[in-house]
Amino acid sequence: MDLRSFFPLSLRLLLVRIRWFWKHYRSIRYDSELFNNVHGPLTYNTDGLATSNNADFMREERFARAYKAAAATNPWPGFTLQWRIHVVCWCAEQASLLPGDFVECGVNTGAYARSIVEYLPFNSLGKKFYLLDTFQGLDPRFISDAERTRGIDNYKYRDSYAEVVQTFRDFDVRIIRGPVPDTLSQCDTGQICYLSIDMNNVLPEIAALEYFWEKVVDGGFILLDDYGFPQHELQKAAFDRFAEARGQSILCLPTGQGIIRKARTPLYHETNTGR
C-alpha cells in the first residue's frame, strides 16, 4: 500500500516543493530578486508565470467563453490557466485551417479540449476530435524511478470518464479510454492537424509522438503541455532528442508549454564542422 495516499494533496505538493528547495537552496543568493525589470503593475501572476506585459486576450469575449467552459470541467480547485488556454486556442485555430483531425493524449476532465470546441465552430469544421486517457491518472507501469524521485506520481486524479462523456456529448468527439500506448491503434484518423500531449511522464508521451508523427500534416501543430516545467526535465530531454533526430525545432514558452510546428523538410542545424 502506498502510504502517500493517506496524506492530502496539498501536503504532498508541499513536500515536493520542500524537496526542490532543499536541492537548490545553495544556488539562491541572499539578495536574489524575485521580480526583475517589470515594466509596470503585473497583468498576470499565476501558473508559474508573472508578467507586466499586455494580457488583453483575457477580456476578449470569445476567449472568455472558452475559458469559462474549460474551468467548468473543474480539473482541480483554484484552476487558473488562462495563458496556457490562450495558447491552446491559438494553436487550435491555426490548425483548423489545415487538413486533418484533432488528437489529445492526456485529457483529465477535458478542460483544454472543451476550450477548443467552444472557441472554434468545431462541429462545422468537418473534423473529429480524439481524446485518449486513462481518465483516472497516470499508469504506474510507465513511471520510471527517476520520475518518481521528482514526485511525478504524487499527483492524484479522480475518475473523470463519465464527466468527460457528458461534457462532450454534443460534439464530434471520440473518447478512447485506456493507457497510452496501449490504446493508440484505436485512434483511426489518417491525418492530424493538431496534437496535444499532456500525460506527465516520458514513456507514453514519446510513444504517442512516435506513433502519430507521420500522420501529422506539414505545418501541423504539436502542443507539449509539460515541456518547460522544472519537475518535467526528463520529458523535455526526450522531446529535444526526438525533435533533433528529425530536424525539427521546439518553441519553449514562458507558460511551460512547448510547440512544434511540423516542418516539411528538416531545419538546418549548424554543426561543429562549420558547414
Regions found by a protein language model. Give the residues of each.
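S-adenosylmethionine/decaboxylated-SAM
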Residues: 47-82, 89, 96-275
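Membrane-proximal basic amphipathic "stem/tether" segments
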Residues: 1-72, 263-265
